[in-house]
Amino acid sequence: AETLVAAKIVKDVKSGVKVLANGELTAKXLTVKVAKVSAAAKAAIEAAGGSVEEA
């Protein structure tokens, strides 16, 4: 979450970040550490060779 705030992708993180599936995932071997993730987003990340860690 701190990385997203530092990159000015989000303004503030109080309760963590939830990743939702919307659009096309072009990154490969992406590792994501988030509070929540939708099933579709998790499947897309894993299909692209990445991994998801839920806090």
From Swiss-Prot:
Under Pfam families, the record lists: Ribosomal_L27A
Q: Which InterPro entries does the annotation name?
A: Ribosomal_uL15/eL18, Ribosomal_uL15/eL18_sf, Ribosomal_uL15_CS
State the PROSITE patterns in the record: RIBOSOMAL_L15
Where does the sequence pass through the membrane? Answer: none
**What GO MF terms are annotated?**
rRNA binding; structural constituent of ribosome
Q: Keyword RNA-binding: yes or no? A: yes
Question: Does Ubl conjugation appear among the keywords?
Answer: no
List cellular component terms (GO).
ribonucleoprotein complex; ribosome
Q: What's in the keyword line of the UniProt record?
A: Ribonucleoprotein, Ribosomal protein, RNA-binding, rRNA-binding
- GO aspect biological process, one term: translation
Indicate the quaternary assembly.
Answer: Part of the 50S ribosomal subunit.
Name the family: Belongs to the universal ribosomal protein uL15 family.
Q: What does this protein do?
A: Binds to the 23S rRNA.
What is the protein's given name? Large ribosomal subunit protein uL15
**Source gene?**
rplO
